[in-house]
């Protein structure tokens, strides 16, 4: 009987890193691999997103203590060398215990110490960069990785553009023309703030909807983020608008397919998932995103007619209300069809193939 191969998947921080990692982890497991996940545990009061999402899916969950330094104070920066040494040592312990045949990094600061140690310990390293502007961790690790993949073109030298690893549900939705064919009445609006929510959208959208006559007002599903549900509920009550509110959407693919229009941030996973489903979207990039990468992500679709882009500073309740009232389904289905032409749906298979080629 052949030995079971093992992969150590490194990803953490936000859904933009975690969900592509889960797609790869699940595909490897289906092919008989033993998969361990390396992430951060967070704190008792604020556990990390990966610690909440990964263990319930049946993967062994390993942790080290490391987090980002951008925007932190001088004390955090001064302690960085000591924190790195600790994270390097913890990473070595994890790698020696797990004994992975391949290490797969999908971004987040947690991937840096373990990625470096995996190379020093002679483990093949496969990287995937989700954003159109590479993060600092992947910029460094790409120079020592065995294989590098990207979700967008021309992001890293010597990288292969394959799209984002997607959960299968995103590639199984009906074509936009079929979905839109029988739709009548008020628009179905989905507001998505990303895995952590979006305070600005939570405040702006209810005010915009209040400016639209109730008879023609869109039907709304609004994802708040785990810590913002009560504040969002108060915003809708103050605006006198009814909406379905949820902290988290479990079946995002179906929600995207059911919506006529999505108002959302422009994280890499969101943009590539919208392309895979073929959905119409108004992108409002997070203004504080590192290197303004969300704007670049959105432009990838918008430049080809696959959605609209408005900066947060330019979007007011009045402007959004006017846009929603003037938007017709014909324009939405055309946008959805254009978005779908930009899809790349085989990233997961590329990463799995690389793992199988590199495994000893």
From Swiss-Prot:
SUPFAM superfamilies for this protein: UDP-Glycosyltransferase/glycogen phosphorylase
E.C. designation(s): 2.4.1.227
A single BP term in Gene Ontology: carbohydrate metabolic process
Pathway field: Cell wall biogenesis; peptidoglycan biosynthesis
Role played: Cell wall formation. Catalyzes the transfer of a GlcNAc subunit on undecaprenyl-pyrophosphoryl-MurNAc-pentapeptide (lipid intermediate I) to form undecaprenyl-pyrophosphoryl-MurNAc-(pentapeptide)GlcNAc (lipid intermediate II).
Annotated InterPro entries: GlcNAc_MurG (IPR006009), Glyco_trans_28_C (IPR007235), GlycoTrans_28_N (IPR004276)
Residues noted as binding UDP-N-acetyl-alpha-D-glucosamine in the record, renumbered to the chain: 14-16, 131, 167, 195, 249, 294
Pfam families named in the record: Glyco_tran_28_C (PF04101), Glyco_transf_28 (PF03033)
Reaction catalyzed: di-trans,octa-cis-undecaprenyl diphospho-N-acetyl-alpha-D-muramoyl-L-alanyl-D-glutamyl-meso-2,6-diaminopimeloyl-D-alanyl-D-alanine + UDP-N-acetyl-alpha-D-glucosamine = di-trans,octa-cis-undecaprenyl diphospho-[N-acetyl-alpha-D-glucosaminyl-(1->4)]-N-acetyl-alpha-D-muramoyl-L-alanyl-D-glutamyl-meso-2,6-diaminopimeloyl-D-alanyl-D-alanine + UDP + H(+)
Bilayer topology annotation: Peripheral membrane protein
GO function term, MF aspect, one: undecaprenyldiphospho-muramoylpentapeptide beta-N-acetylglucosaminyltransferase activity
Tagged with keyword Cell cycle: yes
Species of the source: Polaromonas naphthalenivorans (strain CJ2)
Keyword vocabulary terms for this entry: Cell cycle, Cell division, Cell inner membrane, Cell membrane, Cell shape, Cell wall biogenesis/degradation, Glycosyltransferase, Membrane, Peptidoglycan synthesis, Transferase
PANTHER family attached to this UniProt entry: GLYCOSYLTRANSFERASE, UDP-N-ACETYLGLUCOSAMINE--N-ACETYLMURAMYL-(PENTAPEPTIDE) PYROPHOSPHORYL-UNDECAPRENOL N-ACETYLGLUCOSAMINE TRANSFERASE 1
Family, per entry: Belongs to the glycosyltransferase 28 family. MurG subfamily.
Listed Gene3D superfamilies: Glycogen Phosphorylase B (3.40.50.2000)
Leader sequence residues: none
Name of this chain's protein: UDP-N-acetylglucosamine--N-acetylmuramyl-(pentapeptide) pyrophosphoryl-undecaprenol N-acetylglucosamine transferase
Intracellular or extracellular location(s): Cell inner membrane
GO CC annotations on file: plasma membrane
């Amino acid at each position: 009987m052949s030995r079971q191969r093992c992969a150590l998947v490194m990803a953490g921080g936000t859904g933009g890193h975690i969900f592509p990692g889960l797609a790869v982890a699940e595909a490897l497991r289906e092919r008989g691999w033993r998969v361990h996940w390396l992430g951060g545990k967070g704190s008792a009061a604020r556990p990390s997103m990966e610690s909440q999402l990964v263990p319930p899916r049946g993967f062994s969950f390993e942790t080290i203590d490391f987090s980002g330094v951008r925007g932190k104070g001088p004390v955090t920066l001064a302690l960085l060398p000591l924190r790195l040494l600790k994270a390097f040592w913890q990473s070595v312990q994890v790698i020696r215990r797990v004994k992975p045949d391949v290490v797969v990094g999908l971004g987040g600061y947690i991937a840096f110490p373990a990625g470096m140690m995996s190379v020093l310990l002679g483990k093949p390293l496969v990287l995937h960069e989700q954003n159109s502007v590479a993060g600092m961790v992947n910029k460094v690790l790409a120079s020592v990785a065995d294989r590098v993949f990207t979700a967008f073109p021309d992001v890293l030298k010597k990288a292969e553009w394959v799209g984002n690893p997607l959960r299968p549900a995103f590639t199984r939705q009906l074509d936009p023309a079929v979905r839109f064919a029988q739709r009548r009445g008020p628009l179905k609006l989905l507001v998505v703030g990303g895995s952590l929510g979006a305070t600005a959208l939570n405040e702006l959208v209810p005010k915009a909807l209040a400016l639209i006559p109730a008879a023609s007002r869109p039907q709304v599903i609004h994802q708040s983020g785990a810590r913002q549900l009560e504040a969002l509920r108060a915003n809708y009550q103050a605006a006198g608008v009814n909406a379905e509110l949820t902290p988290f959407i479990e079946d995002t693919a179906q929600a995207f397919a059911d919506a006529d229009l999505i108002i959302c941030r422009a994280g890499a996973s969101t943009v590539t998932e919208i392309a895979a489903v073929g959905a119409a979207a108004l992108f409002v990039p997070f203004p504080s995103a590192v290197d303004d990468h969300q704007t670049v992500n959105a432009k990838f679709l918008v430049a080809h007619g696959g959605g609209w882009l408005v900066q947060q500073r330019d979007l007011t309740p009045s402007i959004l209300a006017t846009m929603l009232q003037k938007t017709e389904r014909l324009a939405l289905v055309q946008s959805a069809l254009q978005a779908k032409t930009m899809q790349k749906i085989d990233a997961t298979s590329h990463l799995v193939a690389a793992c199988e080629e590199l495994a000893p």
